[in-house]
UniProtKB/Swiss-Prot annotation:
Entries under SUPFAM superfamilies matching the protein: SAM/Pointed domain
Polar residues compositional bias, start-end: 271-281
Pfam families per record: CP2 (PF04516), GRHL1_C (PF25416), SAM_3 (PF18016)
Region of interest called Disordered, as start-end residue ranges on this chain: 219-245, 271-301
Protein name stated in the entry: Transcription factor CP2-like protein 1
Molecular function terms, GO-annotated: DNA-binding transcription activator activity, RNA polymerase II-specific; DNA-binding transcription factor activity, RNA polymerase II-specific; RNA polymerase II cis-regulatory region sequence-specific DNA binding; sequence-specific double-stranded DNA binding
Region (SAM2-like domain) residue spans: 261-365
Subunit organization: Forms homohexamers via its SAM-like domain. Interacts with MTA1; which is indispensable for TFCP2l1-mediated self-renewal-promoting effect and endoderm-inhibiting action.
Principal cellular location given in the protein's record: nucleus
Functional description taken from the UniProt entry: Transcription factor that facilitates establishment and maintenance of pluripotency in embryonic stem cells (ESCs). With KLF2, acts as the major effector of self-renewal that mediates induction of pluripotency downstream of LIF/STAT3 and Wnt/beta-catenin signaling. Required for normal duct development in the salivary gland and kidney. Coordinates the development of the kidney collecting ducts intercalated (IC) and principal (PC) cells, which regulate acid-base and salt-water homeostasis, respectively.
Length: 479
């Protein structure tokens, strides 16, 4: 059972005005009028987020609060609505989608965030920066953690009901501090929550609200020791000095901010895993491109460097493949010049890590996938009569399969790869099932994907979802 921290009754959704008056009475908001007029109340943000962790007492007045967290410990974030339920009538859906991120607070690190996170991924293979503790969370639906975004999780929730998400931060602040003599001061992070509502197409892309707070993450129990140290330091100060600092609050109020610019993945719009549809003739590529009728592909960042590439082309290739820091160094190099360089040359010029990465990128060396499966859409397989398949000898009589390469071996990755293969949005695939004995449909879990036999063949069958806005996929054993 979820334990709710001791809080005043103004956390109740129907006493939102009283709750906001207490929030605005905090020292960092002293410049604001504590009493809310009806006009101001109408302009209140629709949502409020509260991190159930104490703020540091060593923060001066009018400065942003700072909260200490323990690595790997579950912390509750309460998702609250400020206004009356009638104010949510403009929402065209019962649910909203929230994305929680852990990002850098310092602007300097924000500019190099991608490189910083890639370095962390390299040093901590298989780990995530941010996780959601699903068993402790309440009132959230369809929680997701994308394998490509280690610092973000997302889920659906109903603003009209009580909801709490418990998060775990697995990186510590000193992991991004240059190591010199030990005891370096850790860098601050931010916990940011961006919430979206559905647009006319049923996609959660219309921004509703964003808020964030400043945190520092310590090794287990380190946050408690730091909080105690700050409290003891404040107790030694004079009463006049204490007036310059904020008191420590039991919870942390996330303050409004601009939305995070990167929204790379859309959540599934169907929260229920059940289905009651029947097999139908709708194809995955309906209204979109299929593998037999591909759309024109856009250039991607993993393209190969050609010997005929000019100096300008080589510069663009370096940018696309995340070698921008070496563009000035290779300002006069053409594609042929770069291709002539050996591995030792690049390691000596760029350093071991970037040199090896640049050499592999130049030579077009791809990492062998952990698993390969082959899929064929049922409509494609049945397009030619069976007798023609047996008697014919031309390629037109063959069932064409397409290779899917899996790295993470998760259901989410499988859905994304199938959606990409048939040029549809991943949100249109609600569930994936595998046809078992006697024709039963077994939900495909991460464990099942991990136990697929390498180079297995599947025929994809589709079932219309009960909400009529997507499909369920059934994997049948192929030929």
């Amino acid at each position: 059972m979820l334990f709710w921290h001791t809080q005043p009754e103004h956390y109740n959704q129907h006493n939102s005005g009283s709750y906001l008056r207490d929030v605005l009475a905090l020292p960092i908001f002293k410049q604001e009028e504590p009493q809310l007029s009806p006009e101001n109340e109408a302009r209140l943000p629709p949502l409020q987020y509260v991190l159930c962790a104490a703020t540091s007492p060593a923060v001066k007045l009018h400065e942003e609060t700072l909260t200490y967290l323990n690595q790997g410990q579950s912390y509750e974030i309460r998702l609250l609505e400020n206004r009356k339920l009638g104010d949510f009538q403009d929402l065209n859906t019962k649910y909203v989608k929230s994305i929680i991120r852990v990002v850098f607070h310092d602007r300097r690190l924000q500019y190099t965030e991608h490189q910083q996170l890639e370095g962390w991924r390299w040093s901590r293979p298989g780990d995530r920066i941010l996780d959601i503790d699903i068993p402790l969370s309440v009132g959230i639906l369809d929680p997701r953690a994308s394998p490509t975004q280690l610092n973000a999780v997302e889920f659906l929730w109903d603003p009209a009901k009580r909801a709490s998400a418990f998060i775990q931060v697995h990186c510590i602040s000193t992991e991004f501090t240059p190591r010199k003599h030990g005891g370096e001061k850790g860098v601050p992070f931010r916990v940011q929550i961006d919430t979206f509502k559905q647009n006319e197409n049923g996609e959660y892309t219309e921004h509703l609200h964003s808020a964030s707070c400043q945190i520092k993450v310590f090794k287990p129990k380190g946050a408690d020791r730091k909080q105690k140290t700050d409290r003891e330091k404040m107790e030694k100060r004079t009463a006049q000095e204490k007036e310059k600092y904020q008191p420590s609050y039991e919870t942390t109020i996330l303050t409004e901010c601009s939305p995070w610019p990167d929204v790379a993945y859309q959540v599934n719009s169907a929260p229920s895993p059940s289905y009651n549809g029947s097999p139908n003739s709708f194809g995955l590529g309906e209204g979109n491109a299929s593998p037999t009728h591909p759309v024109e592909a856009l250039p991607v960042g993993s393209d190969h460097l050609l010997p005929s590439a000019s100096i300008q082309d080589a510069q663009q290739w370096l940018h696309r493949n995340r070698f921008s820091q070496f563009c000035r160094l290779f300002a006069s190099f053409s594609g042929a010049d770069l291709l002539k360089m050996s591995r030792d040359d690049l390691v000596q010029i760029c350093g071991p890590a970037d040199g090896i990465r640049l050499f592999n990128a130049i030579k077009g060396r791809n990492v062998r996938p952990k698993m390969t499966i082959y899929v064929c859409q049922e409509l494609e397989q049945n397009r030619v009569p069976l007798q023609q398949k047996r008697d014919g000898s031309g390629d037109s009589n063959l069932s064409v399969y397409h290779a899917i390469f899996l790295e993470e071996l998760t259901t989410l990755e499988l859905i994304e790869k199938i959606a990409n293969l048939y040029s549809i949005s991943p949100q249109h695939i609600h569930r994936v099932y595998r046809q078992g004995p006697t024709g039963i449909h077994v939900v495909v879990s991460n464990e099942m994907v991990q136990n697929f036999q390498d180079e297995s063949c599947f025929v994809l069958s589709t079932i219309k979802a009960e909400s009529n806005d997507g499909y369920h996929i059934i994997l049948k054993c192929g030929l």
